[in-house]
Amino acid sequence: MPINKYKAAVVTSEPVWENLEGGVVKTIEFINEAGKAGCKLIAFPEVWIPGYPYWMWKVNYLQSLPMLKAYRENSIAMDSSEMRRIRAAARDNQIYVSIGVSEIDHATLYLTQVLISPLGDVINHRRKIKPTHVEKLVYGDGSGDSFEPVTQTEIGRLGQLNCWENMNPFLKSLAVARGEQIHVAAWPVYPDLSKQVHPDPATNYADPASDLVTPAYAIETGTWVLAPFQRISVEGLKRHTPPGVEPETDATPYNGHARIFRPDGSLYAKPAVDFDGLMYVDIDLNESHLTKALADFAGHYMRPDLIRLLVDTRRKELVTEVGGGDNGGIQSYSTMARLGLDRPLEEEDYRQGTDAGETEKASSNGHA
């Protein structure tokens, strides 16, 4: 039975930097908190685990190497006990979980968003299709079968995009065409315009993301938009500063950027600069009726006979096998299946109460 009215939570908090176990524990704590508050959905920021590597915007190659190694060591594999513990928390709290992680698959990292159902099943696994600027030094590109933004759920057609994907007109068009009703615009951590240094464009700062890009998404798509944002402390700034470089001493410009917008683009909620925790929203999907009546770019307000979007959702792999089918064609497979995300949770294992030491047995799964 579809649920049109429900409570949701948006995370605006500091990650546990480069600490996989600490990140999992904090994630489960927030899921528990949202569950106790009666939420049907909780939305986490981009690469919440193990935090956004903001240092990559500030260091040279040699300075980056020890930081990159630590970051890779604390990224999460999809078929790991850590991920199953998060899935179990979603199941135990009967809540949808949209979470951004640094995923390690073989030897490559991806900016990944996972959508977990109240049954603990992974119902969407998507990878950012193109890391932004210096992010290309850390992460790889998503593939055809891992960029679908929208999933049909009992709480509506729920979409997810990472960071600057939220201003990509083609990805927005795809989400609109899928009939998106509620959107998670997951953001990392970066400063506001008070830290702007010429000639760096204003595009590269947090307040345009929060107060221009995110409400524009709501207006253009007619959806509820939840925009979780990471926070950072002075101690966190030190962690993102290489040895021999003077760290910043004021974290204020980096904080207070999470937002919630209604389907007409009006602001529902924003946090105080010093707020760390969960922001709550009472979603009513029926609010989008009038915005969609005015402008439905997947329906009455579009001309597909004139403008169309070509989408290729096939997996492209380095090694491609031919044969095996009735027509001897090229074999294909699902990334989700290869990663084990199509397997249900085992009832006897990976409960929230699993001893932390037990998590070691699968924590290296998929790591280089």
UniProtKB/Swiss-Prot annotation:
Temperature and activity: Optimum temperature is 42-55 degrees Celsius.
Induction of synthesis: By cyanide.
pH dependence as annotated: Optimum pH is 7-8. Active from pH 6 to pH 8.5.
Gene Ontology terms, MF aspect: cyanide hydratase activity; nitrilase activity
Gene3D superfamilies, per database record: Carbon-nitrogen hydrolase
Active site location: 46, 128, 163
Enzyme Commission number(s) of this protein: 4.2.1.66
Ranges where the CN hydrolase domain occurs: 6-285
Keywords: Hydrolase, Lyase
InterPro entries documented for this protein: C-N_Hydrolase, C-N_Hydrolase_sf, CN_hydrolase, Nitrilase/CN_hydratase_CS, Nitrilases_CHs
One example of a Gene Ontology biological process annotation: cyanide catabolic process
Catalytic reactions of this protein: formamide = hydrogen cyanide + H2O
Superkingdom of the organism of origin: Eukaryota
Region (Disordered) location: 341-368
Traits of the deletion mutant: Highly sensitive to cyanide, but retains virulence on sorghum.
UniProt cross-references to PANTHER family, sorted A to Z: CYANIDE HYDRATASE, NITRILASE
Protein family according to the UniProt entry: Belongs to the carbon-nitrogen hydrolase superfamily. Nitrilase family.
Function: Catalyzes the hydration of cyanide to formamide. Degradation of cyanide may be important for plant pathogenic fungi in infection of cyanogenic plants.
Assembly: Oligomer of dimers, forming left-handed helical fibers.
UniProt name for this protein: Cyanide hydratase
Annotated source species: Microdochium sorghi (Zonate leaf spot disease fungus)
Top-level taxonomy: Eukaryota, Fungi, Dikarya, Ascomycota, Pezizomycotina
